[in-house]
Amino acid sequence: GDYNPGGRLAVTFPKSVGQVPFAFPFKPGSDSKGRVRVDGVLYPFGYGLSYTTFEYSALKISKPVIGPQENMTLSCIVKNTGKRAGDEVVQLYIRDDFSSVTTYDKVLRGFERIHLQPGEEQTISFTLTPQGLGLWDKNNQFTVEPGSFSIMIGASSQDIRLKGSFEVQ
């Protein structure tokens, strides 16, 4: 117990074999035989254990509205609220809320590993670029579509601590 591990999973572990493969974008619903798909996972992408706890706060979005070729900066504060020093991997996910093609529910667009002493806090910043917002449209062209995007910052793909949104014009 002298060392606090801070590793994170680089894959998702499904609850059942029937969920595999699920490495493609899909819309929720039933299968061809009318059975409803099992939702949820055993261990989500980015999951990890720690002997301490972390609190996320103060999400700041540099611009609520951006153009398709603009960068955006996001930041938040992470504080070690436990009694041990530890590493945290702060993960940034986005979602195109109304895309013209089916996309993933959320996509990892950045992560930052930090080491904090008990009671210490640190501001974490991420930069979103047009490349990170784009998708391949139905004409097989890479584009940044106008519309609303959701921002999710957390400790794993399911343990989302902060949420926000912005718009691309």
What is the predicted role of each segment?
Residues R95, T129-Q131, G154-S156:
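Short, loop-centered acidic/histidine patches that primarily coordinate divalent metals
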Residues G1-D87, Y93, R113, P118, ...:
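Secreted, periplasmic, or luminal enzymes acting at the cell surface/secretory milieu
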Residues S100-W136:
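Intrinsically disordered, low-complexity Pro/Gly/Ser/Thr-rich segments with frequent PxxP/GP/PP motifs
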Residues G132-S148:
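Short glycine/proline/serine/threonine-rich loop/turn segments at secondary-structure transition edges
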Residues G164-F166:
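C-terminal edge beta-strand
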